[in-house]
């Protein structure tokens, strides 16, 4: 009887694991893919990111040194100068098991603004967004999202 109960329990556990929703490959997507700015003048490139429903990512300034901040790193490219990214203010969030500890996170859509100056024509601003995603129960290992934004200087 005990052996059958253990087998039934193992089968139910396996069914729950198999029926659990799969974790996304990426918890964030870059929602903007191209912009147009005045050529040879200071402008702002807005990179809009979308966090997958049910998840949040630590802001650029999380409230704990144990958490990994969201960080945009851009590569140098011909015809385009990019300044220091300006991150939005995060939203306070608390896990249900630790309601007294407030975290600073991004959920839904958030925009990082980057000062740019581009010459006339088409240019590509590339880099990476490093982030740590969490859901209501746990935080996951950090990930890196490749970022590519086409910038037209007119």
PLM region descriptions:
Residues 2-8:
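Sec-dependent signal peptide recognition
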Residues 16-154:
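Extracellular/lumen-exposed scaffold segments
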């Amino acid at each position: 009887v005990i052996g059958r109960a253990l087998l039934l329990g193992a089968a139910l556990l396996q069914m729950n694991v198999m029926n659990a929703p799969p974790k996304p490959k990426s918890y964030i997507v870059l929602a903007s893919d191209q912009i147009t700015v005045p050529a040879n003048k200071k402008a702002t490139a807005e990179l809009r990111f979308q966090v997958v429903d049910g998840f949040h990512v630590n802001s650029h300034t999380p409230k704990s040194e144990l958490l990994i901040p969201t960080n945009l790193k851009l590569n140098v490219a011909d015809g385009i100068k990019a300044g220091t990214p300006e991150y939005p203010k995060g939203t306070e969030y608390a896990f249900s098991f630790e309601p007294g500890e407030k975290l600073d996170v991004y959920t839904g859509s958030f925009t990082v603004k980057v000062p740019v100056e581009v010459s006339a024509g088409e240019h590509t601003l590339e880099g990476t967004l490093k982030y740590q995603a969490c859901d209501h129960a746990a935080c996951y290992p950090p990930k890196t999202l490749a970022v590519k934004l086409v910038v037209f200087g007119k």
